[in-house]
Structures are given as structure tokens and as C-alpha cells.
Amino acid sequence: MIHTAQFYINLEKEEKIFFEDKYDEDISIAITNINNVYGCKGITINYTTKNYGIFAIYFVIDFIKLLGKTDITVNDIDDINFEIYNFIVDVTGRYIEPIMIRIDYRLDVSVNLKEREILMYLYNKTLDKYGYKKKYNQYQTTIYYNCKSIQAKIYDKEEERKFKNENINDYEKDMLRFEVSLCNSHLNYNKRMYNMEKNIETYLHAELYKAYFKRHLEIFIQSGDYYTIYKARKKINNSNIKESDKEKLVEFLKCISKNGATKATKKYSDYYIKKYKRYLEELEINPILIPKNMKEAPTYIKNPFNLCA
């Protein structure tokens, strides 16, 4: 459900003295010393600030490392808070309530290499823009759908590790990762408008997690499994759709396959786009087809983006 989150704590004079006495007066050395202890446990201080005499520590938590497991749910909140409590008390001498300024939701799905390559190719044909969100796809194994306050992306986790020359953990092998990051401005908006506290417990709920993925990723990649035109046409022809609409639906799929989803929205009216998408949802066919001439491509790929799995 979650991967990482960033927090900060403000230190009073006594707490800063404790921090320096225990780890070092030189802040950079102190950070290195702390990270040497806590980095393997999933907690890393990335920087400190001093504004108007207030000293603040900013740190990132990798919840998979913190708890030693990948399936993290609201049932783990006590263990998460226990580890955060111990860390803060250790570096400041007492507990200070941390303020969350970013959280990264994740959905990891095991997909073989060939299908990961094909899926990343297909994701390039998704909409270029939806609302305030824009697609950025300059990288072969990563696609972003960003606005100022929320960043969504799809990437090949194993290939990302290789690119960074980092070790690949067992839970990262063959993984296609879907990720939605809520930035501080969005958390502040939720706090202001809905009185949602900026802490991990508030955001560690399955329904909220699903809502963010649907709103910020599913609108681009859509539901339904992936087919070649031959397989899709066969499924359409065997359906209960009106005969007059069957060939029109096939032509709609061909248009997206050839030109991408963005150009298809310019050719078809909103009425027909909604109509054809409704048909495709009923048939569980993704609007983006597997190219029939793609080398060694299968004729069917199950959609890995399944929030009910």
C-alpha cells in the first residue's frame, strides 16, 4: 500500500543540544552518524534547516525496510508509530510529533520482462493530459502523470535499480510499480478543507489508497485487459452489443492503436468516447491494443493494474 513518506520535526534549544551532544556538533557529521545507524532500518535524515532560530530535521521513512515486509496496512500503524517514536526520542531526547509532508502510495505487480516492455510501450499511447495532470514519458522504463501537488508514475522497478547500479531486493524483482505521491501542498489542502491530519495514520486506509489510484492513474491507463485487434474484434462480435456499433467500436480501437488516445479524443466527440468506453468496460477490453506486428508479443495480457487484487 505505501512505500515511503517524508516528515519533519522542529527542535527546541534543549533538543538541538541533545542532538549535537549525542551525534556531533557538525550537522553533516551528525546526519551521517545517524543514517549509519538507522538507514538499514528504513529511516534516513536527508537534510536540516534553520529558519527564524528554529532547527528542523527532515527525514524519509521506507516502510518496507522499517517493518521488514511489503504488505503494509492500517493494522501496522502501532508498529509504525512505535519505530518512529523510538527514532525521534533517540535523536532528540524526547518525543516530538512529526509532521508528514509527503507520502508515496504504491502498487507492485509481478510481470515478466517481455510483458513489462510491452506494457510500457502501450502506456505511451495513453492520454497526454487530463485536467491539470500531464504525461511525461521521456524515459523508456518510466512514465509520469504529474500536476503540482500530486505525482503519479509507472515504472519498471527492477530496471530502475539496474540503472542506478543498486542492489535489487527480492521484493523488487520482476516488479512493475504503480505509484502516487501526495506532496505537501496537497496534504495541506486536505488539512484545510477536510480537517485531515498530516500523519501516517490518516492516510493508511485502503479506501483512500484506492481512490487516489483511480483518480490519478486509472483515468490514464484505463481498466480492462489488453488484446490484439484480432482477439478484441472476436470478443466484440460475440457480445450483445448492437450490430451497428460493433464495427464502429473496432474502428475506435484502431484509431487509438494507430494515433494514441489523445488524437482519438480530437476525432471523436465526448458522447461517442463515453459510449465506446462503456462498451469496452463491459467487455473488459482495454482501449489500447497490443500491436499485431510486435515481435514475440502475446495476443493477450492481463491488466496488472487491479486495485481489487
Regions found by a protein language model. Name each.
Residues 273:
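Helix-turn-helix DNA-binding segment
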